[in-house]
C-alpha cells in the first residue's frame, strides 16, 4: 500500500513539468532579423536592446520632399549639384530618407540615385556612393520644422583663448538660402530659416512620376539623359 502511494505522488509531481515542457516546445518560433534562423519571439522583440519601438530603423525609406523655410524644395541632381527649386513637382526634389541609426538619416535623390553629403569644408554635394559624409543628425525643431546636421563634421572650440566652454560644439547644418543656393554648414545656425526643413509627403503628381520612373523605361531614360549644353556661350569664353 505504501508503495502505491509513493508511485501515485511521484506521478502527480512529474505530470505538470512534462506538460509545461511540451507547451514550451509547441510555442511558435519566428524568423530572427538575421540569418533566417528561428528564435523565441521575446528574443526577437528584444534584439538590439531596443524593443519594438525602433523596429522601423533600417527599414523601407520614407519618400519625402524637404521644403525649406526659405520656400525652396531641396534638389539632388544627376551631375552632383545641390540646390533649391520653387517648382512644386520637380522630380529631383523627391527624396528617400532612410534611418541608419537612432536619430541619424541618409538622404538620397530618388531620380538621381545620389546621396546628399557634406564635405570637410561644409559644402553640400551629391555623392554617387554612400559614405560617412552622407549621414545627418535629424532633429525636430520647436517650430515644427526639422534640421539636418552633419554627423561627421562640426565646429569644436579650442580650449585656449576662448570664453566658450569646451563642450559648446556647433553643428554644421544643411541649408538653402533665399536664392535657392546651399550655404556652407559652419555658417548656419539651427534657428535660421535657411536650415529649417519641413518633410512633405508626395502628392498625386509626384506619385505618378515615381510610378512611371519604375515602370516606364522610356520615361526613365528621358529623366536620366544628360541635358544638352546651351548654344549661347558666356562672355569671356
UniProtKB/Swiss-Prot annotation:
Glycosylation sites: 83
GO terms under cellular component: cytoplasm; extracellular space
GO biological process terms, semicolon-separated: fibroblast growth factor receptor signaling pathway; neurogenesis; positive regulation of cell division; positive regulation of cell population proliferation; positive regulation of MAPK cascade; regulation of cell migration
One Pfam family named in its UniProt record: FGF
Keywords: Developmental protein, Differentiation, Glycoprotein, Growth factor, Mitogen, Signal
Signal peptide interval: 1-21
PROSITE patterns the record matches: HBGF_FGF
MF-aspect GO terms: fibroblast growth factor receptor binding; growth factor activity
Record-linked InterPro entries: Fibroblast_GF_fam, IL1/FGF
Superkingdom of the organism of origin: Eukaryota
Gene3D superfamilies on file: 2.80.10.50
Family: Belongs to the heparin-binding growth factors family.
Function field: Plays an important role in the regulation of embryonic development, cell proliferation, and cell differentiation.
Identification of the protein by name: Fibroblast growth factor 3
Organism: Xenopus laevis (African clawed frog)
